[in-house]
């Protein structure tokens, strides 16, 4: 279910963090630069992605490696929704594939959640949904955030408007 939060401080901040990913021109910018951030509230971000050829495996389905990259990105954006500009470093990440996620031209949704943000460790989860809102994969991401919490670009006082 989409959360309509257009224009909020949280959505603006999350989009600015995503723009920094793109501007850095690293891995995320090359693999999933066309992701759209639909909504964001503290602790939750919803994104969509229209699948292109470079997102697919040789069988024409969404590649598991792309789902892993999106788990990483989704976790980072969920932490951005809590005010972190830099989201720390990965400790552990896993994905569970329930069914094929889509083919060329189909759109998927990501529901990224910050399950817990502590003073050292953060836990995030991402549900991957088809355009008909069926969950086809789940991702979990644990990050070390202690150093990230001190970044001057953080906006740790984000709250819903």
UniProtKB/Swiss-Prot annotation:
Enzyme class: hydrolase
InterPro entries: ACOT13, HotDog_dom_sf, Thioestr_dom
Keyword Hydrolase: yes
CDD domains: PaaI_thioesterase
Keyword presence, Hydrolase: yes
Gene3D superfamilies attached to this UniProt entry: Hotdog Thioesterase (3.10.129.10)
GO BP, sorted A to Z: acyl-CoA metabolic process; fatty acid biosynthetic process
Superkingdom of origin organism: Eukaryota
Coiled coil segments of this chain: none
Single Gene Ontology MF annotation: fatty acyl-CoA hydrolase activity
GO cellular component, one term: nucleus
SUPFAM superfamilies from the UniProt entry: Thioesterase/thiol ester dehydrase-isomerase
Keywords: Hydrolase
EC number: 3.1.2.-
Family, similarity comment: Belongs to the thioesterase PaaI family.
PANTHER family for the chain: ACYL-COENZYME A THIOESTERASE 13, THIOESTERASE SUPERFAMILY MEMBER-RELATED
Protein name: Putative esterase C31F10.02
């Amino acid at each position: 279910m989409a959360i309509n939060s257009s224009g909020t401080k949280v959505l603006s901040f999350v989009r600015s963090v995503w723009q920094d990913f793109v501007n850095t021109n690293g891995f995320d910018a090359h693999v999933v630069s066309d992701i759209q951030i639909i909504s964001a509230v503290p602790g939750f971000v919803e994104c969509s992605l229209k699948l292109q050829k470079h997102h697919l495996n040789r069988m024409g389905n969404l590649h598991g490696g792309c789902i892993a990259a999106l788990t990483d990105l989704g976790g980072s954006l969920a932490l951005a929704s809590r005010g972190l500009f830099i989201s720390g470093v990965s400790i552990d990440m896993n994905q569970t594939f329930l069914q094929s996620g889509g083919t060329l031209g189909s759109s998927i949704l990501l529901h990224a959640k910050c399950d817990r943000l502590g003073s050292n460790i953060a836990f995030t989860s991402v549900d991957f949904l088809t355009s008909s809102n069926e969950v086809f994969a789940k991702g979990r991401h644990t990050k070390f955030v202690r150093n990230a919490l001190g970044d001057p670009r953080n906006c740790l006082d984000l709250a819903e408007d």
